[in-house]
Amino acid sequence: MAISKEEVLEYIGSLSVLELSELVKMFEEKFGVSATPTVVAGAAVAGGAAAESEEKTEFNVILADSGAEKIKVIKVVREITGLGLKEAKDATEKTPHVLKEGVNKEEAETIKKKLEEVGAKVEVK
């Protein structure tokens, strides 16, 4: 008996955010793909030199190392991301880990400062 596309969509719709996140990770591993959005190169070609001189406006905040004060880092990670305790703990143990994607420069620097204050090593890219 084959499962219809509608049944698959209904099942996915019933998943919690955590379960859906785990499912996405499984898809990425099984099929060797990434769920991160890709940038269209055609727009940059049309802009020419003007596009190259523009300052980057979106940044990713990456936890490179959680340091010695893991509990404090977990608390800050939970505050920043809204993750649950287990997910925040996993994020601090599996470094490097992207905590926030596509944030503005000011927010990225604020997050970096908060994490560095509790002993974490953070990269902003």
From Swiss-Prot:
Gene name of this polypeptide: rplL
GO molecular function (one): mRNA binding
The organism's taxonomic lineage, starting at the top: Bacteria, Pseudomonadati, Campylobacterota, Epsilonproteobacteria, Campylobacterales
Family, as annotated: Belongs to the bacterial ribosomal protein bL12 family.
Name under which the protein is recorded: Large ribosomal subunit protein bL12
Key words, A-Z: Ribonucleoprotein, Ribosomal protein
Chain's role: Forms part of the ribosomal stalk which helps the ribosome interact with GTP-bound translation factors. Is thus essential for accurate translation.
UniProt xrefs under CDD domains: Ribosomal_L7_L12
Gene3D superfamilies in the record: 3.30.1390.10, Single helix bin (1.20.5.710)
Transmembrane region(s): none
Subunit note: Homodimer. Part of the ribosomal stalk of the 50S ribosomal subunit. Forms a multimeric L10(L12)X complex, where L10 forms an elongated spine to which 2 to 4 L12 dimers bind in a sequential fashion. Binds GTP-bound translation factors.
